[in-house]
């Protein structure tokens, strides 16, 4: 994905303010609630039977934080997303068999969570930059599927 210097700045400046655990847990929780078929990849997480159970599930919150830590790795390597996510792509493709469309869904939810948390600070230009980033990450994660 090609990001301009301004877009890279928009991403990195906002990233420094993101509450990783809260935002990651919220994003993964929303994915599981809005797209319930995605929960099949998380059967070992325990109770995911309703929104309250999902959003209060410590394993969901912990894995969501882990996802955002991986986004932090992406932000440190904006010019090499495929290399950054090569091992995760292989894991999700070969071992977990995750539908790569799910990466796009989660990326869009992350953008929604950021917009909600940052309000007016999450400008149109910031949203454009983040949409490009999450699309690039989704593409990098889907790389081993091609």
From Swiss-Prot:
Chain positions with N-acetylvaline modification: 1
Disulphide-bonded residues? none
Q: Which residues bind heme b?
A: 63, 92
Describe tissue expression: Red blood cells.
Question: What biological-process terms (Gene Ontology) are attached?
Answer: hydrogen peroxide catabolic process
Q: Which residues carry this modification: N6-acetyllysine?
A: 59, 82, 144
Q: Which residues carry this modification: Phosphothreonine?
A: 12
Q: Which CDD domains match?
A: Hb-beta-like
Q: Which GO terms describe its molecular function?
A: haptoglobin binding; heme binding; metal ion binding; organic acid binding; oxygen binding; oxygen carrier activity; peroxidase activity
Instruction: Provide this UniProt record's keywords sorted from A to Z.
Output: Acetylation, Heme, Iron, Metal-binding, Oxygen transport, Phosphoprotein, S-nitrosylation, Transport
Query: Keyword Transport: yes or no?
Result: yes
Gene Ontology CC annotations of this record = blood microparticle; haptoglobin-hemoglobin complex; hemoglobin complex
Q: Which SUPFAM superfamilies match?
A: Globin-like
**InterPro entries in UniProt:** Globin, Globin-like_sf, Globin/Proto, Hemoglobin_b, Hemoglobin_oxygen_transport
Gene3D superfamilies with a match to the protein in the record? Globins (1.10.490.10)
**Is Transport included in the keywords of this UniProt record?**
yes
Q: Which Pfam families does the protein's record reference?
A: Globin
Record's subunit section: Heterotetramer of two alpha chains and two beta chains.
Q: What does this protein do?
A: Involved in oxygen transport from the lung to the various peripheral tissues.
Q: Please report the name of this protein according to its UniProt entry.
A: Hemoglobin subunit beta
Question: Which organism encodes this protein?
Answer: Osphranter rufus
Q: What gene codes for this chain?
A: HBB
């Amino acid at each position: 994905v090609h990001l301009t210097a301004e877009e890279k700045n928009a991403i990195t400046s906002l990233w420094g303010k993101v509450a990783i655990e809260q935002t990651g847990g919220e994003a993964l929780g929303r994915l599981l609630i809005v797209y319930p078929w995605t929960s099949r990849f998380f059967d070992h997480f325990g109770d995911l039977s309703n929104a309250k159970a999902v959003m209060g599930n410590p394993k969901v919150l912990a894995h969501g934080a882990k996802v955002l830590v991986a986004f932090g790795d992406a932000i440190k390597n904006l010019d090499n997303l495929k290399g950054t996510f090569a091992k995760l792509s292989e894991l999700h493709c070969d071992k977990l068999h995750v539908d790569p469309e799910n990466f796009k869904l989660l990326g869009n939810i992350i953008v929604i969570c950021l917009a909600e948390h940052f309000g007016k600070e999450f400008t149109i230009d910031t949203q454009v930059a983040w949409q490009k980033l999450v699309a690039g990450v989704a593409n990098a994660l889907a790389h081993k599927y091609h």
